[in-house]
Regions:
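Domain-level detector for secreted/extracellular nuclease and nuclease-toxin modules, and
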Residues: 1-274
C-alpha cells in the first residue's frame, strides 16, 4: 500500500501546521512536494511519525512520544523490513549486515531502546525508513548513544511523557554541501545518501488541568563525524535548528509557549530540572 499523505505547505514564520494530528505535541511541520511522504506507525496507539523524502530515500525527521511504558527489556529483534505505508521502490533494502563494508551502521531515528517495552512497536523501529547511515565508532556507539540513553532516562525518572524529534540534514539552509553515498551491501546497486548532520530535539511540558501551561525544549546538533566529548556540549536553540533545516518544530504548542521555549539554547541541567 502506498500512502502519500497530505503534507502541508511549510510557512515561516507562523502559519505552520502539524503534519498529521493537532493533539500530538511531538509533530513538526511538513514541506510541500510530491517526493515527501508522512507516515505514522501504530501499535494500538501511535508509535512514531516519519517525514520521508522518497527522492533521497531518507527520513528527514522522525517524531515520537516517549514514556516509561514504551521501554522495557525485550531482546533486540533480527532483520529489517519495509515500511508497509510507503511504496517499496522508495525504500532502501537494508539487512542486519548493511554498511558492514564501510564505517557506517544503521542509525535508528526512533531508537530500539525507546520502544523495547512493546514487541510490535519495537519491530516497527526496524522498518528501513527508520534508519540512515551513521558513523559507528565514536558517534552512533558513543555520543549519540549516550544522548539517547539520557533522553530515555528523563522519561523514566520523571515518570512523564516527553516528545522527541530526531532528524538529519544534508546541508543547512543556504549552504551547499557535497553529498556522499554508500550502498547497503557490496552486491547492491542502490546508492544511499549519507547525511552530513544529525539533530535531536526534546520537549517537556507542564499542565494546568488538561491545558499545557509551560514548556521547555532542548536541541542538539551534530556534524556527521567522530566525537570524544559529551552531548551536553552540543546544545543549540530550537530556533537555530529551524533556521538550518527549514522545518518548524513542536507546532502544536500554544504559540506563546513555543516562542519562549524555542528561542534560547537550554542547558542539560536546566532542562532536566524543569
Amino acid at each position: 500500500m502506498f500512502y502519500a499523505g497530505t503534507p502541508t505547505v511549510f510557512k515561516m514564520p507562523g502559519g505552520a501546521q502539524p503534519a498529521v494530528n493537532k493533539d500530538w505535541l511531538e509533530l513538526a511541520s511538513a514541506k510541500e512536494g510530491s517526493q515527501y511522504v508522512v507516515s505514522t506507525t501504530y501499535a494500538g496507539e501511535r508509535n512514531y511519525t516519519v517525514f520521508y523524502d522518497t527522492q533521497m530515500t531518507t527520513p528527514l525527521w522522525t517524531a515520537y512520544p516517549l514514556d516509561s511504558s514504551h521501554m522495557g527489556s525485550l531482546d533486540r529483534p533480527s532483520g529489517w523490513s519495509y515500511n508497509p505505508n510507503i511504496d517499496e521502490k522508495y525504500q532502501v533494502r537494508v539487512t542486519d549486515g548493511s554498511y558492514s563494508n564501510s564505517t557506517y551502521s544503521r542509525g535508528h531515528m526512533c531508537p530500539n531502546g525507546s520502544r523495547n517495552g512493546n514487541s510490535t512497536m519495537q519491530a516497527q523501529t526496524f522498518y528501513v525508513t527508520n534508519q540512515v547511515p551513521q558513523i559507528q565508532n565514536s558517534f552512533n556507539n558513543g555520543i549519540w548513544s549516550n544522548l539517547e540513553n539520557a533522553v530515555q532516562g528523563i522519561a523514566k525518572s520523571h515518570n512523564e511523557e516527553i516528545y522527541v524529534v530526531t532528524g538529519v540534514a544534508f546541508e543547512k539552509e543556504g549552504e551547499s554541501r557535497t553529498i556522499n553515498y554508500t550502498s547497503p551491501s557490496k552486491s547492491s546497486s542502490q546508492r544511499v545518501p549519507i547525511p552530513n548532520y544529525f539533530y535531536k530535539l526534546v520537549l517537556r511540558v507542564k499542565y494546568s488541568g488538561r491545558t499545557v501551561s509551560d514548556a521547555s525544549c532542548i536541541a542538539f546538533w551534530f556534524d556527521q563525524k567522530a566525537y570524544s566529548d559529551s552531548y551536553q556540549n552540543h546544545t543549540v536553540s530550537v530556533d537555530q535548528v529551524e533556521a538550518w533545516t527549514g522545518f518548524d518544530f513542536f507546532v502544536n504548542l500554544p504559540d506563546d509557549l513555543e516562542s519562549a521555549a524555542e528561542s534560547k539554547p537550554t542547558t542539560w541541567s536546566s532542562f532536566t530540572s524543569f
